[in-house]
Amino acid sequence: MAQRTRLGDILRPLNSEYGKVAPGWGTTPVMGVFMALFLVFLLIILQLYNKSILIQDVRVGW
C-alpha cells in the first residue's frame, strides 16, 4: 500500500485531471498557431545566418 506524504497531498490536485480529454479539438488550433509562429522565427534566424536578410545597422560577424 502506498504511503501518504505531505508532498503527495500538496501535489494531488495537479494530477486530478489525469486521463480526461477535452471534447472536440480542444486547444489544437492554438498549438498550431504557435508552431507556425515558431517556424517563422526559425526561418528568420536561418536567413539572418545565411545573410539572405540584411538588416540595417545589424552586423553579423561569426
Swiss-Prot record:
InterPro entries: PSII_PsbH, PSII_PsbH_sf. One of its GO terms (molecular function) is phosphate ion binding. One of its GO terms (biological process) is photosynthesis. PANTHER family: PHOTOSYSTEM II REACTION CENTER PROTEIN H (PTHR34469:SF4). It is found in: Cellular thylakoid membrane. One of the components of the core complex of photosystem II (PSII), required for its stability and/or assembly. PSII is a light-driven water:plastoquinone oxidoreductase that uses light energy to abstract electrons from H(2)O, generating O(2) and a proton gradient subsequently used for ATP formation. It consists of a core antenna complex that captures photons, and an electron transfer chain that converts photonic excitation into a charge separation. The keyword Transmembrane applies. Keywords: Membrane, Photosynthesis, Photosystem II, Thylakoid, Transmembrane, Transmembrane helix. It holds the Pfam family PsbH. This is Photosystem II reaction center protein H. It comes from the Bacteria. HAMAP family: PSII_PsbH. It is a single-pass membrane protein. The chain crosses the membrane at residues 29-49. Belongs to the PsbH family. PSII is composed of 1 copy each of membrane proteins PsbA, PsbB, PsbC, PsbD, PsbE, PsbF, PsbH, PsbI, PsbJ, PsbK, PsbL, PsbM, PsbT, PsbX, PsbY, PsbZ, Psb30/Ycf12, peripheral proteins PsbO, CyanoQ (PsbQ), PsbU, PsbV and a large number of cofactors. It forms dimeric complexes. One of its GO terms (cellular component) is photosystem II.
